[in-house]
C-alpha cells in the first residue's frame, strides 16, 4: 500500500524520514462555531485536545497520532477505541502484557513519548480525513525536555499533518508507520508489528 504526500510516494512500511465545565451557550458555540466564529459545516464539531502528552526526560521515541477519536475523547486517553491495535502492538513489541488502565499504559510508554499532531480542529466524528482548521500541538516542548531520537507518525494523516504544521517549526523529520486504526484493515497485527519493529 502506498501513501502519496505532496507528489511523493511512501510505502506503508517506509522507514525513510521526511519527514471546565461549559455553560449551555458556550457549549453551543463550541459545537456550531470555531474560534474564528465562522459556522461549521453540517456534522462538524470544534474540538479541543484535552489530555496531556505522555513522556519524561528518558523518552527517546516520540509517537504522534493525528487527533483523538470520539472514543478516546470519552475515555480521556489515547487510542481508546477497543478495535484500535495500538496498545496490543506496543505490548507485543515491548514483550509485556497488554496494559488495561491508563496508569499502566503511561508506565509502559514512558520510554516512547506519545502525543498528537493537532491540539484543536473542526472534525466530523472520528474521521481524520474530515479535519479542518487544525491548530498544531507544540511538539517543541517535548523535544526540549527529552532527547528524542526518532519521531514516528502513526498513519498517513498524522504524517501529512506533521510535515505541514510541525516539521517547519521543529526542523525534525518524522518516519511514517502504518496506522493502527481499525480503519486500516489491510494491515493485520502481524504486518503492523513487522513495520513498527524497525524502530
Predicted regions mapped to residue ranges:
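Short, low-complexity intrinsically disordered segments enriched in A/P/G/S/L with frequent Arg
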Residues: 8, 25-26
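Short, surface-exposed acidic-centric catalytic microdomains
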Residues: 71-130
Amino acid at each position: 500500500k502506498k501513501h502519496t504526500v505532496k507528489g511523493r510516494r511512501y510505502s506503508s512500511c517506509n522507514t525513510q524520514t521526511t519527514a471546565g465545565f461549559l455553560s449551555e451557550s458556550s457549549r453551543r458555540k463550541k459545537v456550531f462555531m470555531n474560534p474564528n466564529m465562522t459556522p461549521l459545516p453540517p456534522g462538524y464539531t470544534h474540538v479541543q485536545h484535552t489530555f496531556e502528552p505522555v513522556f519524561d526526560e528518558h523518552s527517546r521515541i516520540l509517537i504522534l497520532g493525528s487527533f483523538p477519536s470520539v472514543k478516546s475523547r470519552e475515555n480521556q486517553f489515547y487510542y481508546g477505541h477497543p478495535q484500535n491495535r495500538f496498545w496490543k502492538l506496543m505490548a507485543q513489541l515491548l514483550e509485556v502484557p497488554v496494559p488495561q488502565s491508563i496508569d499502566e499504559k503511561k508506565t509502559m510508554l514512558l520510554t516512547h513519548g506519545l502525543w498528537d499532531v493537532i491540539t484543536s480542529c473542526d472534525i466530523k466524528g472520528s474521521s481524520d480525513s474530515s479535519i479542518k482548521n487544525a491548530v498544531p500541538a507544540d511538539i517543541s516542548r517535548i523535544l526540549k525536555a527529552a532527547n528524542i531520537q526518532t519521531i514516528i507518525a502513526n498513519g498517513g494523516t498524522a504524517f501529512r499533518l506533521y510535515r505541514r504544521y510541525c516539521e517547519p517549526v521543529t526542523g525534525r523529520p518524522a518516519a511514517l508507520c502504518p496506522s493502527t486504526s481499525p480503519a486500516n484493515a489491510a494491515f493485520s497485527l502481524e504486518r503492523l508489528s513487522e513495520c513498527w519493529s524497525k524502530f
